[in-house]
């Protein structure tokens, strides 16, 4: 299940996101939708990077047995709008790409240190759900 916290004016359709999440996990996901100023604060606090970013993931501690929550994904709608326009696809498609990217981080994938597994899993999901190329795929 996706627990949506949306502090923006954008309508977020969680049905497709639920379908994607359910192919990878049975755990719950907290999805927080914000603007650049809010994600910048989080980026500074947790990564010591004082600028906005597109998506952040906060996995739960797996030492807790049977924890129903996988973690939290935070997405900036400002980035979604910008990239959707730049790459000529819909807001919903770009949002879904960022959701997939964040979800894979919650599941332990890390494109910054792995041998391409994160990119390959993203490509698999992009193809399965008929989405345009994601940032990680566009940059490879």
Swiss-Prot record:
This is Endoribonuclease YbeY. Keywords: Cytoplasm, Endonuclease, Hydrolase, Metal-binding, Nuclease, Ribosome biogenesis, rRNA processing, Zinc. Belongs to the endoribonuclease YbeY family. The keyword Heme does not apply. One of its GO terms (biological process) is rRNA processing. It holds the Pfam family YbeY. One of its GO terms (cellular component) is cytoplasm. Single strand-specific metallo-endoribonuclease involved in late-stage 70S ribosome quality control and in maturation of the 3' terminus of the 16S rRNA. HAMAP family: Endoribonucl_YbeY. Its cofactor is Zn(2+). Its main location: cytoplasm. Zn(2+) binds at residues 101, 105, 111. InterPro entries: MetalPrtase_cat_dom_sf_prd, YbeY, YbeY_CS. It is found in: Cytoplasm. PANTHER family: ENDORIBONUCLEASE YBEY, CHLOROPLASTIC. Binds 1 zinc ion. Its EC number is 3.1.-.-. One of its GO terms (molecular function) is zinc ion binding.
